[in-house]
């Protein structure tokens, strides 16, 4: 459990740092930083699932700290949900629908790409 907590702390710290940097770099009415972080997390989880778990390269003791802890706290469903509701409340329906559609489609594609990369990795 301590490993999951440590992974969670690192993932939250990484999300905050990357999110702050992306927000300053890419100011927009669309929640692009949240989308980018969630897609990166989906790619990482796809890779870890394929390489670390399915191919057995990640020791059992590291699985939960990496997946549930780090990647789980790095990605954020709650922030994505709030971002979407705020767009709806502001009457920005097209942006809200784009956020939902793009997040789902690109997130699933990122998991798929992560797994494909994992199975091609030769180490």
Curated annotation (Swiss-Prot):
Primary localization: membrane
InterPro entries in the record: FluC (IPR003691)
GO biological process: cellular detoxification of fluoride
Recorded coiled-coil stretches: none
One Pfam family this sequence matches: CRCB
Binding-site positions, Na(+): 72, 75
Keywords annotated in UniProt: Cell membrane, Ion channel, Ion transport, Membrane, Metal-binding, Sodium, Transmembrane, Transmembrane helix, Transport
Transmembrane segments: 30-50, 68-88, 93-113
Membrane topology: Multi-pass membrane protein
Reactions listed under catalytic activity: fluoride(in) = fluoride(out)
GO MF, any single term: fluoride channel activity
Regulation of this protein's activity per its record: Na(+) is not transported, but it plays an essential structural role and its presence is essential for fluoride channel function.
Described purpose of this protein according to its UniProt entry: Fluoride-specific ion channel. Important for reducing fluoride concentration in the cell, thus reducing its toxicity.
Family: Belongs to the fluoride channel Fluc/FEX (TC 1.A.43) family.
PANTHER family given in the database record: FLUORIDE EXPORT PROTEIN 1-RELATED (PTHR28259:SF1)
Name of this protein: Fluoride-specific ion channel FluC 2
Organism annotation: Symbiobacterium thermophilum (strain DSM 24528 / JCM 14929 / IAM 14863 / T)
Lineage: Bacteria, Bacillati, Bacillota, Clostridia, Eubacteriales
Encoding gene per record: fluC2
